[in-house]
Swiss-Prot record:
The keyword Hydrolase applies. GO terms for biological process: DNA restriction-modification system. The lineage of its organism: Archaea, Methanobacteriati, Methanobacteriota, Methanomada group, Methanobacteria. Keywords: Endonuclease, Hydrolase, Nuclease, Plasmid, Restriction system. Its EC number is 3.1.21.4. It catalyses: Endonucleolytic cleavage of DNA to give specific double-stranded fragments with terminal 5'-phosphates. It is an enzyme of class 3 (hydrolase). The gene is mthTIR. InterPro entries: Restrct_endonuc_II_NgoPII (IPR019046). This is Type II restriction enzyme MthTI. It comes from Methanothermobacter thermautotrophicus.
Length: 281
């Protein structure tokens, strides 16, 4: 069974991070989508340590219980472990596009947006979720930021309340409204009754570099070198196998630091957390 600490060590061990020439990815006419797909493959290889393996699918099936895509989140679920949602951006000043899914503190099997295959991939009710955010200017991976959802996002009820308020506003217009997995659909908006209006949320969240700038000064990110950052609650860090914790704590150029972050549900409360950081020299 793999985990984030093992993935970090595997990423540190390789030197080539030019995703434009990454092996095992089919070419796409859409360059932006291509980099997103390539980052997903890169991270699968990081969790499975399959950077130099030709037949990756056999190993993937050993390590992952579910593999999704941009239309079927999450992007991957580690067997007996965490869910991973991959996001690609071109600069740290760019916000993260979450599209129609609000930020997740955890992944719940009851989530209407996940597929039946995802729900049935294991016997599970709730999973920790990692947002894996890669900054890829000019097709080269420069910053890899892993942040657990419960450090980054509020409880589902916070966002669901906003969704219900928006839906309530649409209902109150007196227009013909249909419930959907999005915010809704307004039917027959023109005199012929032939046009419908889909109403969907487009959720955007700030880059964690901005959110956690008190513990990760943006100026400390070295633009010319590769940087890797991971943030999790202290209790989560302690759940990793002892051998993985010892290995990463003893590794050159990796710093493991105790930090405090604001509770996403109550900023007056501080959470004991752990920051793992690798700055390539």
């Amino acid at each position: 069974m793999s985990n984030l600490l093992q993935a970090i060590m595997n990423i540190k061990s390789i030197q080539e991070r030019n995703l434009g020439s990454y092996k095992g990815v089919q070419d796409s006419k859409n360059r932006m989508n291509q980099m997103g797909v390539t980052l997903e493959v890169f991270l699968k290889d990081a969790f499975c340590n399959t950077f130099d393996i030709e037949n990756k699918d056999l190993v993937y099936s050993e390590y992952f219980s579910y593999l999704g895509n941009q239309n079927n989140p999450p992007d991957m679920i580690l067997k007996g472990g965490d869910a991973v949602e991959v996001k690609k951006i071109t600069g740290i000043k760019t916000s993260i596009q979450l599209n129609s899914s609000y930020p997740k503190s955890k992944l719940f099997v009851s989530d209407s947006r996940i597929t039946e295959a995802c729900k049935n991939c294991e016997d599970w009710e709730v999973k920790d979720i990692i947002y894996a955010i890669g900054t890829i200017p000019n097709r080269v991976l420069k910053l890899m930021f892993f942040v657990y959802g419960d450090c980054y996002a509020a409880s589902p009820s916070i966002y669901q309340r906003i969704v219900e308020e928006v839906k309530g506003g649409l209902h109150s217009t007196g227009l013909e409204f249909s419930e959907t997995n999005e915010l809704g659909r307004i039917n027959r908006v023109d005199p012929l009754g032939i046009t419908d209006l889909r109403v969907r949320g487009m959720w955007i969240i700030k880059h964690p570099i901005k959110v956690f700038k008190n513990i990760i000064p943006p100026e400390s990110i070295k633009n010319n070198n590769f940087n890797l950052i991971a943030l999790m609650k202290a209790e989560k860090y302690k759940q990793f196998p002892k051998k993985d914790r010892k290995r990463i704590e003893a590794e050159d150029n990796i710093e493991v630091t105790d930090v405090k972050i604001k509770d996403p549900d109550n900023p007056a409360k501080l959470l004991d957390s752990v920051l793992v950081r690798y700055d390539e020299i």
